[in-house]
Curated annotation (Swiss-Prot):
It is a peripheral membrane protein. Keywords: 4Fe-4S, Cell inner membrane, Cell membrane, Iron, Iron-sulfur, Membrane, Metal-binding, NAD, Quinone, Repeat, Translocase, Ubiquinone. It is found in: Cell inner membrane. It comes from the Bacteria. The keyword Thylakoid does not apply. The lineage of its organism: Bacteria, Pseudomonadati, Pseudomonadota, Gammaproteobacteria, Enterobacterales. It is an enzyme of class 7 (translocase). Its EC number is 7.1.1.-. Its main location: membrane. Belongs to the complex I 23 kDa subunit family. GO terms for molecular function: 4 iron, 4 sulfur cluster binding; iron ion binding; NADH:ubiquinone reductase (non-electrogenic) activity; quinone binding. NDH-1 shuttles electrons from NADH, via FMN and iron-sulfur (Fe-S) centers, to quinones in the respiratory chain. The immediate electron acceptor for the enzyme in this species is believed to be ubiquinone. Couples the redox reaction to proton translocation (for every two electrons transferred, four hydrogen ions are translocated across the cytoplasmic membrane), and thus conserves the redox energy in a proton gradient. This is NADH-quinone oxidoreductase subunit I. SUPFAM superfamilies: 4Fe-4S ferredoxins (SSF54862).
């Protein structure tokens, strides 16, 4: 070992200790997660929920667009029909162990029934516990769009009732009467 190699080796050791000394007193970048809340951006895509319309009814009309739009095929549902003619999902299942939280199901939903919330704490010990049924996904409120009602906006009538005669539904506006 030559003197030059010895000096270079000693210099790298001193430089390493200098860098350690500099970074030892800097503010830590690691967040202590459970104690400190995590900042999430406003449009963060986390847990998927099913919402209700302002009347308290299920928004999902079992159109199957969410299942078709899902790139990994983690959504499955079966359509059924109420006596008044409204469709609803007999069962609605999402396998969160396969879900990539891309948000395509939310974009495809015409009734805004599927919404992604900023909740990300979904850790389970068993893979079977990550398969959520409709009862697990359905929340009591309307979610991000509190005033939107698919049947009212689309102008669809319900069997046995004219447009605007359903519970908590306003009569349709005659737009032709507004023209000059």
């Amino acid at each position: 070992m030559t003197l030059k190699e010895l000096v270079v080796g000693f210099g790298t050791q001193v430089r390493s200790l200098w860098m350690i000394g500099l970074h030892a007193f800097h503010k830590r970048e690691t967040q202590m997660y459970p104690e400190e809340p995590v900042y999430l951006p406003p449009r963060y895509r986390g847990r998927i929920v099913l919402t209700r319309d302002p009347d308290g009814e299920e928004r999902c009309v079992a159109c199957n667009l969410c299942a078709v739009a899902c790139p990994v095929g983690c959504i499955s549902l079966q359509k059924a029909e109420h006596k008044d003619g409204r469709w609803y999902p007999e069962f609605f299942r999402i396998n969160f162990s396969r879900c990539i939280f891309c948000g395509l199901c939310e974009e495809a939903c015409p009734t805004t029934a599927i919404q992604l919330t900023p909740d990300f704490e979904m850790g389970e010990f068993k893979r079977q516990d990550l398969v959520y049924e409709k009862e697990d996904l359905l929340i009591s409120g309307p979610g991000k769009y509190p005033e939107y009602n698919f049947y009212r906006m689309s102008g669809m009538a319900i069997d046995g009732k004219l447009k605007g005669e359903a519970e908590n539904e306003a009569k349709p506006i005659d737009v032709k009467g507004l023209m000059p």
